């Protein structure tokens, strides 16, 4: 079992890597319809995932409902889904496009949930049927899906995941909502569909410590610039 201290070591390494590879303005987190929970939640959990991944479905079925009940619905954690299709084309990419096209109509999460519920039965011909089931404008969805809109954004998500050092799905990042990762408060990288208790241990530890006040000066440190260039600065 991966220990919390090892997770923090992995995260610190990922933060350094991101600082070297990411442009200064990369990926400020905005509400694009793929966020569950309160914007004021002190902790943010980001998932990098593939709709065709068995372990991702395991997280969706077994762990996410418990996180939702204990932390997300209670205003302690906000949850973000990010795409990490394991191939450059095929059903995994098409599923990500379908979810984004549903999101364009304000129905991202119903499609997200449907796709994971149907994992193993997904194929190219199924997505328009799901759009009908969840009540989307079928003409608008078909145009969005057939044109493969959002591909650039989908692959940008995947680039972020690989910069964290994730080479499989799912992968998770825990950060403080106000301020994002810093040298003093690094992100927590959680590779794989670990049990609920491991998420809870890290979340509870973060909740138990007083969050840094927004705008509070960071003590000078040779790695401060790395943290400031992180693509996960929250506004």
Q: PLM features: residue spans?
A:
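Bacterial N-terminal signal peptides that target proteins for export
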Residues: 1-11
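Bacterial N-terminal signal peptides
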Residues: 9-20
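Short, solvent-exposed loop/turn segments at the edges of secondary structure
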Residues: 14, 93-94, 167-169
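Bacterial Sec-dependent signal peptides at the C-terminal "C-region" and cleavage site
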Residues: 18-29
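A short beta-strand-turn-helix
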Residues: 27-43, 71
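Structural alpha/beta surface segment adjacent to cysteine/selenocysteine redox centers
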Residues: 41, 49-132, 137, 205-213, ...
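Soluble periplasmic/extracytoplasmic beta-strand elements of cell-envelope proteins
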Residues: 44-47, 78-81, 171-173, 189
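C-terminal cap of thioredoxin/glutaredoxin-like
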Residues: 62, 129-235
């Amino acid at each position: 079992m991966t220990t919390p201290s090892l997770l923090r070591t992995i995260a610190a390494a990922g933060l350094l890597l991101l600082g070297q590879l990411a442009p200064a303005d990369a990926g400020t987190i905005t509400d694009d319809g793929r966020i569950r929970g309160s914007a004021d939640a002190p902790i943010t959990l980001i998932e990098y995932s593939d709709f065709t991944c068995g372990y991702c479905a395991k997280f969706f079925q077994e762990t996410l409902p418990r996180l939702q009940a204990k932390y997300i619905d209670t205003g302690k954690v906000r949850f973000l889904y990010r795409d990490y299709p394991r191939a450059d084309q095929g059903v995994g990419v098409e599923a990500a496009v379908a979810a984004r096209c549903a999101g364009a109509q304000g129905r991202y999460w119903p499609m997200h949930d449907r796709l994971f519920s149907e994992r193993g039965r997904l194929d190219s011909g199924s997505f328009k049927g799901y759009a009908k089931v969840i009540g989307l404008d079928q003409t608008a969805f078909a145009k969005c899906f057939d044109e493969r809109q959002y591909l650039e954004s989908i692959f940008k998500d995947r680039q972020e995941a690989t910069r964290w050092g994730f080479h499989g799905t799912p992968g998770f990042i825990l950060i403080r909502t106000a301020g994002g990762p810093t040298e003093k408060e690094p992100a927590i990288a959680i590779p794989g569909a670990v049990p609920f208790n491991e998420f809870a241990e890290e979340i509870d530890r973060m909740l138990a410590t007083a969050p840094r006040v927004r705008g509070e000066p960071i003590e000078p440190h040779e790695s401060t610039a790395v943290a400031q260039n992180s693509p996960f600065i929250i506004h």
